[in-house]
A protein has these predicted regions:
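Conserved acetyl-CoA-binding loop of GNAT-fold acetyltransferases
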Residues: 4-9, 108, 172-177
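Conserved GNAT acetyl-CoA-binding A-motif
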Residues: 141-144, 171-186
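Conserved beta-strand-loop-alpha-helix junction that forms the acyl-donor binding cleft
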Residues: 2, 16-19, 150-155, 184-186
Length: 186
């Protein structure tokens, strides 16, 4: 590729974590200091359109200064939310509120690469049944966090990392009972 005149511009990172980790002492201290002001809750599917707009607002704000970021439009985010709703189990989208204002969120999805790897791109005649079984009954052992964000005004404060930790912690509490062993965050 480099012989064709292309050169690397930016290295992008992915993080892996085991969901059975213990909270670091610093997070425990921050929780004791600020926890009363923070509420973490799951996405309300009964108000999906409003909730998706909250997530979009947080995401666009949180990522606005990142390299290569292009903000989601309302239509794009609404469509993505509708498309992903069949993959999202209850509790897999967590929203953190600070003093009643939504300021952080996390979306955890099954790792579709694990789920569809042996289907060879074929849903017919029985691939669709295997896919459904693996998503609803025999849950995958790996998950992905494709979307996460903390509002920019909080990112360089002590509460910012706490908010990120709390939505991750709420998400991991949902995946541990499912037998998930690894979560990729990228």
């Amino acid at each position: 590729i480099e012989r064709q005149g292309y050169a690397p511009v930016k290295d992008l990172l992915a993080y892996h974590l085991r969901p059975d980790f213990e909270a670091p002492p610093l997070m425990k201290t921050l929780i004791s200091r600020h926890g009363a002001r923070i509420r973490v809750r799951p996405l309300r599917k009964s108000a999906l359109a409003q909730e998706l707009e909250i997530l979009r607002g947080i995401f666009n704000d949180a990522w606005s200064e990142n390299w290569g970021f292009v903000p989601f439009t309302a239509d794009e985010f609404a469509r993505m939310g509708k498309d992903l709703s069949m993959l999202v189990r209850e509790g897999m989208v967590q929203i953190a509120e600070l003093d009643g204002e939504p300021v952080a969120f996390l979306v955890v999805l099954p790792n579709l690469n694990e789920v569809i790897g042996d289907l060879n791109g074929r849903l017919l005649p029985f691939g669709w049944a295997k896919l459904l079984w693996r998503l609803k009954v025999k849950f995958p052992r790996t998950m992905r966090v494709p979307l996460m964000g903390v509002r920019k005004k909080l990112q360089r404060t002590r509460i910012g990392p706490l908010l990120a930790f709390l939505v991750i912690d709420a998400g991991r509490q949902e995946v541990i009972p499912l037998g998930v062993q690894d979560v990729e965050m990228s």
